[in-house]
Amino acid sequence: MKKPISIILFLVTIFAVSGVCSALEKEDLNIDGIYMDQRMLDVFARYGKPDRIEHGIPVGRICIYNINDGELRVSASSAEESGTVTGVTIIGNTGLAAKTGIKVGSDAEEVIKVYGGKVVIRSPEPKLKEATRMIEHSIEVEHDVRYNPYYGFKDYGKNFYALWFYLNDDNKVIRISFWREYSSE
């Protein structure tokens, strides 16, 4: 029996420090009104206490809400309530949508129409353990220096923002994620 191949639509990766972007703006990283760098206190005011919390490495946490037949996962910059949103994922049929209206169940064609791009093959994702297909777009990298509170030093590297739409074998969206990452150089 052939295993179905999980498909990722790696839609847009935005490299930015000072608002430089292309087809997607940082402000477009918004799922059901939750956006990048929003105060976690605002998320708690809207959704209440999380159903469960996973702690991040080395700092931060992921607040998980069970909504309908799916999950809303909100990553925070700190284990404290005063943290800010660093990423959001919706998995399954939550009824939630990206700012553009794309939601779980949308077709890959709809996503491409809104954001552009094409499907490409990538090597296996560690968690999925199989090859993935995705759409990607990126812009020029900008560098910055930031203070790393965990390690206690200034770090030179780059920030980037990413928005991924994961697809099933029928090219329907099954998961949506956005986040910010920082990589040292």
What is the predicted role of each segment?
Residues 8-16:
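Bacterial N-terminal signal peptides
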Residues 15, 28, 81-84:
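Short, flexible segments with low predicted structural confidence
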Residues 27-33, 95-102:
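Second-shell loop/turn segments in exported
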Residues 21-25:
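Boundary at the C-terminal end of the N-terminal hydrophobic targeting segment
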Residues 1-4:
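Positively charged n-region of N-terminal signal peptides that target proteins for export
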